[in-house]
């Protein structure tokens, strides 16, 4: 062994290992923003919920049984054989020009007239949320969100040290008067609001649809108060009963950033989403994206582009919507049949989720182990609040299991809840 004042080199048959005199405590070096990082409750449940004996009503995994796999295989093979050199090379930081044109065609179904130059392709819409947060949020800035809100957005905002303020919802989504109150209260406290984040169509986690008149009123409020709107729309094309209203971006191209994704309408494993941004913000978005990922995957962009060019994709989306409608119907029927009468729940017209409200004495976090023992998984309501609110609520995801498994899972969950209510003499 050779040694120096602060360094020891241990020689052995294995590769050389270098030791400092004192073991490092690496967690002490973490940045402040990293100290509060933790896995989302959904991710923490994933390992358990993915066990085959568990009926998972937890994660929002799209059901890919309606995806034409043979066609996807053919598209991919043809792409590699005929255009592999481009597909497997680095690409534009803003995204492939052809796909950006096609994305504009997709958004046209939501009433949006967009130019490809204003589209920034991202690694899923989750990366778009990260980019928006990075270029807008300073520590302690306020972000307004729905109550409840998407857990992935809450985690991103927290990572950038934002203060999240929840705005009340009802069965028709965000309440405009509550938004006015939240803005007034926040501004009177001398705090800076950076943007409003919302999911107008079949909201995650509540499943509710924001009506057209509320969209207009919310846009008017935000324009008057000079607050940017971030409109996240993963589920807008997956309506069951009637088309959703036009996107908010369709009415305001200057004060709305629109986020879209192919995760729900094609497949999440391709990891392609996008942001439609006001022209004044595009350069910063592209620079921020290039600094973290260089460019979105050229390969998966071109797979999607070929799919859109060669597949009747509107019909395919309709097939997905029919699949999810059947599962929604099974979930609502099971809730009506098995859940206690004191429980209430939303009745979504599209998307993946149902929001259940139980008597306030019930703690859905405490019930998770009992539900797992009964072979069913769900997400407690507190996951969707930044402040731990919502202990008596939970989210049911009906997108992935079969209708029969959904019925089985909801029946089991109802049994767990009823047993808890009986043991605590809750009506």
What are these regions (language model features)?
Residues 276, 355-357, 397-399:
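Short hydrophobic/aromatic beta-strand micro-patches
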Residues 2-18, 373-374, 386-427:
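PLP-dependent enzyme catalytic core of the Aspartate aminotransferase-like
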Residues 81, 86-226, 230, 236-252, ...:
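Conserved core of the PLP fold type I
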Residues 250-252, 257-322:
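Conserved core segment of the aminotransferase class I/II
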Residues 362-367, 404-408:
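Short, conserved charged micro-motifs
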Residues 19-22, 33-124, 131, 309-310, ...:
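N-terminal small-domain helix-loop-helix segment of the aminotransferase-like
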Residues 305, 322-332, 343-357:
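Conserved glycine-rich beta-strand-loop-beta hairpin in the small C-terminal domain of fold type I
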């Amino acid at each position: 062994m050779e040694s120096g004042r602060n360094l020891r080199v241990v020689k052995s048959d294995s590769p050389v290992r270098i030791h400092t005199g004192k073991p490092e405590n690496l967690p002490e070096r973490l940045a402040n923003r990293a100290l509060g990082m933790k896995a989302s409750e959904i991710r923490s449940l994933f390992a358990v919920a993915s066990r085959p004996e568990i009926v998972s009503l937890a994660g929002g995994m799209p059901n890919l049984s309606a995806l034409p796999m043979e066609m996807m295989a053919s598209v991919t093979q043809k792409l590699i054989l005929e255009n592999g050199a481009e597909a497997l090379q680095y690409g534009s930081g803003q995204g492939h020009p052809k796909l950006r044109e096609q994305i504009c065609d997709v958004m046209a179904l939501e009433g949006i007239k967009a130019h490809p130059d204003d589209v920034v392709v991202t690694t899923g819409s989750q990366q778009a949320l990260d980019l928006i947060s990075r270029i807008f949020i300073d520590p302690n800035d306020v972000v307004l969100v729905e109550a409840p809100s998407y857990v992935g957005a809450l985690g991103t905002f927290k990572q950038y040290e934002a203060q999240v303020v929840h705005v009340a919802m009802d069965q028709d989504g965000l309440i405009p008067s509550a938004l006015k109150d939240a803005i007034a209260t926040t501004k009177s406290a001398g705090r800076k609001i950076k943007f409003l984040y919302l999911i107008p169509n079949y909201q995650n986690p509540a499943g509710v649809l924001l009506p057209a008149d509320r969209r207009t009123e919310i846009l008017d409020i935000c324009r008057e108060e000079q607050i940017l709107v971030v409109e996240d729309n993963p589920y807008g094309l997956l309506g069951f009963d009637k088309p959703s209203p036009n996107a908010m971006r369709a009415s305001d191209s200057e004060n709305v950033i629109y986020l879209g994704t192919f995760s729900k309408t094609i497949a999440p494993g391709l990891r392609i989403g996008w942001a439609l941004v006001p022209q004044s913000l595009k350069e910063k978005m592209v620079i921020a994206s290039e600094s973290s990922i260089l460019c979105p995957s050229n390969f998966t962009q071109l797979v999607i582009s070929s799919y859109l060019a060669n597949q009747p994709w509107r019909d395919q989306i309709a097939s997905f919507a029919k699949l999810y409608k059947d599962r929604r119907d099974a979930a609502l029927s099971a809730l009506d049949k098995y859940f206690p009468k004191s429980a209430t729940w939303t009745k979504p017209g599209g998307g993946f989720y149902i929001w259940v409200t139980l008597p306030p004495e019930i703690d859905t976090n405490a019930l998770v182990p009992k539900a797992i023992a009964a072979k069913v998984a769900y997400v407690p309501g507190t996951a969707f609040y930044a402040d731990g609110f919502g202990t008596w609520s939970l989210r049911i995801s009906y997108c992935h299991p079969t209708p029969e498994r959904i019925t089985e899972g909801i029946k089991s969950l109802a049994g767990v809840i009823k047993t808890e209510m009986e043991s605590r003499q809750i009506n």
